[in-house]
């Protein structure tokens, strides 16, 4: 019989004993996700992250997370015109338990896009790269469909190639004009009611009647250097201290404060 050490007994544990299961949620913390001040609903949800441990800082794990929220939830409005628009918000900074986000893009839901595509009409799309006044480079996509004239007896409403080109040119002109003259906050305020698409629909009536004109997607291609003061201003927290002026104290001429013996 071979004489030797029993490795299982020497470690002080029984063979086959299960390891104690620790709930991973006990090591995590909840943070509130805050939307910028352009939206009616500021508190859009909560997010989880592992607690700060050693060199791993919790706030660094939260930065650059992207949250996709329906416009109906952001505006606290169940209007059908808002429910199919999705806004992407990116976490840029953490203040206490609040995650401050900024605009990162916009999109339409897939079911809305598919419901608009029908037979007997022409689909017209355009996209353009434009820069805002505060240095954001955006790629804006627009979509529209030809509309049948009320007086027409024809089943179809196809636009000619020259008309499609003219409409696409008009789309690019209006998007460029509206975005280049605005900063990011003003652009988002224009996207909320989709005023750019309404301007395009109105301007193209002379070329060919359109309907279902929407800004289909907005991508943020480039951003300026991050500045915390601008982000706080976007969230309405950028003001300094109190605006009240200090009270004036009258002192006699030649007044000197008393010398303190101990400090």
Curated annotation (Swiss-Prot):
Region spans: Disordered: 236-263
Under InterPro entries, the record lists: Ribosomal_eS1, Ribosomal_eS1_euk
| Cross-referenced Pfam families | Ribosomal_S3Ae
Query: Where is this protein found?
Result: Cytoplasm
Q: Which domain of life is it from?
A: Eukaryota
Q: Does the keyword Hydrolase apply?
A: no
CC terms in the record's Gene Ontology section? cytosolic small ribosomal subunit
MF-aspect GO terms? structural constituent of ribosome
Q: One biological process GO term for this chain?
A: translation
Q: What is its main location?
A: cytoplasm
Comp. bias regions, Basic and acidic residues: 236-254
Keyword list (alphabetical) reads: Cytoplasm, Ribonucleoprotein, Ribosomal protein
Query: Quaternary arrangement and interactors, per the entry?
Result: Component of the small ribosomal subunit. Mature ribosomes consist of a small (40S) and a large (60S) subunit. The 40S subunit contains about 33 different proteins and 1 molecule of RNA (18S). The 60S subunit contains about 49 different proteins and 3 molecules of RNA (28S, 5.8S and 5S).
The record's similarity note reads: Belongs to the eukaryotic ribosomal protein eS1 family.
What name goes with this protein? Small ribosomal subunit protein eS1
Tell me which species this is from: Periplaneta americana (American cockroach)
